[in-house]
Regions:
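Generic structural signal for bulky hydrophobic/aromatic residues embedded
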Residues: 56, 175-176, 265-268
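Active-site-adjacent bridging/hinge elements
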Residues: 139-151, 259-269
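Short charge-dense sequence patches
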Residues: 1-6, 115-126, 206-214, 232-245
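Short, well-structured alpha-helical interface segments that form or flank functional binding sites
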Residues: 48, 149, 161-171, 250-260, ...
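Charged, low-complexity, helix/coiled-coil-prone segments
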Residues: 1, 102-119, 198-204, 223-238
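Polyanionic, low-complexity intrinsically disordered segments
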Residues: 211-330
Length: 330
């Protein structure tokens, strides 16, 4: 996959049990992404799977190709003459030009002052994006609405104003958290639900006994009962960090703090003013959040490798002196 130009070499992939081929074609100096299904498939399902493939490619390349679709149907596997043609207008493509993955260090290191030795070191282990992981990523996006939503929020956020970008990234992480929470009891303080129910029941019984000994003003049992009913639910701050444990990614102290700062940005409290330092701090935070959303989406698909560290790439413009590599292993 070559995300820098929104192109792909011919790629065979499997999305939710359907074998698809992804490749490019050029006509009148325009490039088209082509997706073929080699077996009979329902039109609506084909459209869903095609969008999932485009969304997966958009995550990796930073550019989501939409605008317009041409759908051709065929009666035979050779696809020599189409039976029907359908044209669809789509929302505008999203071009962020912020790929998360590269095989060419030189393509992102211009102006960074890296020596050839440093480039060679960073390039160790860089290979093409694994085909199996791409298939799994597209499959996950096809099967799970929360992951599709998170990916779209990530891409839309990259082009949004800072007031919209930061909340979009936090909501993306919340969507992924909801997906992980539905899969696993990892996010609950008490893993065994029967143990939690037993504890909650005993606490409620104790409250019923105690409230008979106190006035309503001195002992507000209704408030206590509401809190006890939520006993086995982590706080929003804690919830956002748990999916990273699920994918075996260790958060740095700064990343953990940024997740804790959710409420500072989620409700649009950040507005651009005259304080350039405040804006630069927010921009730096956005690069960290974008990285974290990417980590979750890729690692849920089984990716192990290196991705671009935009906090470092943009550190000069932001005014941060970061002792970090331009690409990081996840």
């Amino acid at each position: 996959i070559t995300p820098q130009r929104l192109l792909a070499t011919h790629l065979e992939l499997v999305v939710s049990s359907s074998e698809l081929h992804l490749y490019t074609a050029k006509e009148n100096n325009e490039y088209f992404l082509i997706i073929d299904c080699l077996t009979r498939i329902d039109l609506s399902i084909f459209e869903e799977k095609c969008f999932s493939v485009l969304l997966a490619l958009g995550l990796i390349s930073g550019n989501l190709a939409l605008n317009e679709f041409f759908i051709l149907s065929f009666s035979e596997e050779k696809m020599s003459a189409p039976l029907d043609l359908m044209y669809q207008t789509k929302p505008s493509s999203i071009y962020t030009h912020q790929a998360v993955f590269t095989t060419n260090i030189s393509s992102i290191s211009h102006g960074m002052g890296l020596s050839q030795e440093e480039k060679d070191r960073l390039g160790v282990g860089l290979t093409e994006f694994p085909k199996g992981v791409f298939s799994e990523l597209a499959t996950q996006l096809h099967q799970h609405e929360k992951l599709r939503r998170a990916t779209k929020l990530l891409l839309l956020g990259k082009n949004a104003s800072m007031e919209m970008r930061l909340p979009a990234y936090y909501v993306a992480i919340e969507a992924i958290t909801g997906h992980v929470e539905a899969k696993d009891n990892l996010l609950k303080p008490i893993r065994d639900e029967s143990v939690a129910e037993k504890l909650i029941k005993s606490m409620k019984e104790l409250i019923e006994v105690e409230k008979k000994l106190h006035s309503n003003d001195d002992f507000n049992s209704s408030v206590l009962l509401r809190k006890i009913n939520n006993l086995n639910r982590p706080t929003n701050k804690d919830k956002l960090s748990q999916p990273f444990s699920f994918v075996n990614y260790s958060l740095s102290k700064e990343e953990y703090r940024i997740l804790k700062d959710r409420n500072l940005y989620l409700h649009g409290s950040f507005t651009k003013g005259k304080d350039d330092n405040r804006y630069r701090d927010a921009l730096h935070t956005s690069t960290r959040l974008s990285f974290l959303v990417t980590v979750l989406l890729l690692k849920l698909a089984g990716f192990e490798g290196k991705i671009i560290n935009y906090a470092k790439l943009w550190s000069g413009a932001i005014g941060k002196n970061l002792n970090e590599d331009l690409i990081l292993s996840i």
